Design a protein with these regions (language model features):
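Conserved loop->alpha-helix
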Residues: 1-165
Length: 165
């Protein structure tokens, strides 16, 4: 379980496409060691199991199901990804509870700048609409965000400069 607050990023350094899966290597400044192998790491919103650690390089195996439902289907070398370690007992919860079980990829339909903030209009298939409520939470690429407006086939989120950084 995670909370959707991103303190670390990683850079994709190797993508090994297998028959129906991906073996992914990410360079990161996360302080992990061999004792952390098997731990859950939130990578762009998806809960992935850490399978290898070597210095600042983290390896993950991505299943076919995860590829289908996430942006890992279009990931490239040198892409930046959001990383978050799982919540530890007693740690601060700043976002919302994030399981890392991704339902779908959506498209950004429109971006509007309002002052120093950005409003993103994001499409949502009708069958998922019932889960999207105004002032509710949504996780996008691992980031906990508040839904500011809901329409029939899309919803809005507002991103402040701190979140964008």
């Amino acid at each position: 379980m995670f909370n959707g607050i991103i303190y670390k990023k990683g850079i994709v350094t190797n993508i090994k496409k297998l028959k129906s899966s991906i073996y992914l290597t990410v360079q990161s400044k996360m302080k992990l060691s061999n004792k952390d192998i098997g731990s859950s790491i939130c990578c762009n919103g998806a809960c992935l199991t850490l399978v290898k650690v070597k210095k600042n390089f983290l390896d993950f195996f991505i299943s076919h199901e995860t590829i289908k439902k996430t942006n890992f289907k279009i990931i490239k070398n040198n892409d930046s990804i959001n990383l978050e370690e799982s919540i530890k007992f007693g740690s601060k919860i700043s976002g919302h509870y994030v399981q890392g079980h991704v339902d779908l990829c959506s498209k950004v339909k429109k971006i509007t700048q309002i002052g120093k903030s950005w409003v993103l209009k994001i499409s949502i298939p009708l069958k998922f609409r019932k889960y999207i409520i105004e002032k509710g939470s949504v996780t996008i690429n691992g980031v906990s965000l508040t839904i500011s407006k809901v329409n029939k086939l899309d919803f809005d989120i507002t991103i402040i400069p701190h979140t964008l950084n």
